[in-house]
Amino acid sequence: MGNLFGKKKATRVTEQDRAVLQLKQQRDKLKQYQKRITLQMDKERQLAKQLLKDGKKDKALLLLKKKRYQDQLLEKTENQISNLERMVQDIEFAQIEMKVIEGLKVGNDCLKKMHEVLSIEEVEKIMDETHDAIEYQKQIDEMLAGSLTQEDEEAVLAELEAITQGEADLELPEVPGEELPEVPEQEPVREKERVKKKPEREMVAV
């Protein structure tokens, strides 16, 4: 059971994978910092409004200066986040390119092995042999066609006609060999005479 449901083989983690992971972690930290600074700036802005209402203009001005400095920090943070994301994308795309190159390399090696088995010279040899065989067969056909005389042609046609006629005779039904019995020609006349004599006998009886 342990062998059937064992753990899958762990995927090998490369240096590029570690670099991408670190960059993403740094990006997430900067986003958390960005969010925290934004919330703090909103609170201090509300506090500056309240200080102005209370007539504490100097303190309100100090908070607004601090807010301006934090705006600059947010802008720098945004630039750093963009740089990190761009770096992550570049590394991931480079990994894809490496896989493509590895695939091309495997394909090229396979083609080289195939070319070693079937070189250009071998292909040309096969094509030449095929062409020679076709030409040789043509010559044989021409020799056979030209060697028959007119008498031979007529004999061939006569044999073909005989074969065709023989097949046609086989398809016809056979005529029965026994003779049919003859039908007497005077029978109908005698029958008529019987019919005529019958009424005469009936009249005599009456």
From Swiss-Prot:
<feature type="lipid moiety-binding region" description="N-myristoyl glycine">
    <location>
        <position position="2"/>
    </location>
</feature>
<dbReference type="GO" id="GO:0005771">
    <property type="term" value="C:multivesicular body"/>
</dbReference>
<keyword id="KW-0449">Lipoprotein</keyword>
<feature type="compositionally biased region" description="Acidic residues">
    <location>
        <begin position="168"/>
        <end position="185"/>
    </location>
</feature>
<feature type="short sequence motif" description="Type-2 MIT-interacting motif">
    <location>
        <begin position="170"/>
        <end position="181"/>
    </location>
</feature>
<comment type="function">
    <text>Probable core component of the endosomal sorting required for transport complex III (ESCRT-III) which is involved in multivesicular bodies (MVBs) formation and sorting of endosomal cargo proteins into MVBs. MVBs contain intraluminal vesicles (ILVs) that are generated by invagination and scission from the limiting membrane of the endosome and mostly are delivered to lysosomes enabling degradation of membrane proteins, such as stimulated growth factor receptors, lysosomal enzymes and lipids.</text>
</comment>
<keyword id="KW-0967">Endosome</keyword>
<dbReference type="Pfam" id="PF03357">
    <property type="entry name" value="Snf7"/>
</dbReference>
<dbReference type="GO" id="GO:0032511">
    <property type="term" value="P:late endosome to vacuole transport via multivesicular body sorting pathway"/>
</dbReference>
<keyword id="KW-0813">Transport</keyword>
<protein>
    <recommendedName>
        <fullName>Charged multivesicular body protein 6</fullName>
    </recommendedName>
</protein>
<dbReference type="GO" id="GO:0031902">
    <property type="term" value="C:late endosome membrane"/>
</dbReference>
<dbReference type="GO" id="GO:0015031">
    <property type="term" value="P:protein transport"/>
</dbReference>
<dbReference type="GO" id="GO:0000815">
    <property type="term" value="C:ESCRT III complex"/>
</dbReference>
<keyword id="KW-0472">Membrane</keyword>
<dbReference type="GO" id="GO:0006900">
    <property type="term" value="P:vesicle budding from membrane"/>
</dbReference>
<comment type="similarity">
    <text>Belongs to the SNF7 family.</text>
</comment>
<keyword id="KW-0519">Myristate</keyword>
<feature type="region of interest" description="Disordered">
    <location>
        <begin position="167"/>
        <end position="206"/>
    </location>
</feature>
<feature type="compositionally biased region" description="Basic and acidic residues">
    <location>
        <begin position="187"/>
        <end position="206"/>
    </location>
</feature>
<keyword id="KW-0175">Coiled coil</keyword>
<comment type="subunit">
    <text>Probable core component of the endosomal sorting required for transport complex III (ESCRT-III). ESCRT-III components are thought to multimerize to form a flat lattice on the perimeter membrane of the endosome.</text>
</comment>
<dbReference type="InterPro" id="IPR005024">
    <property type="entry name" value="Snf7_fam"/>
</dbReference>
<feature type="coiled-coil region">
    <location>
        <begin position="11"/>
        <end position="103"/>
    </location>
</feature>
<keyword id="KW-0653">Protein transport</keyword>
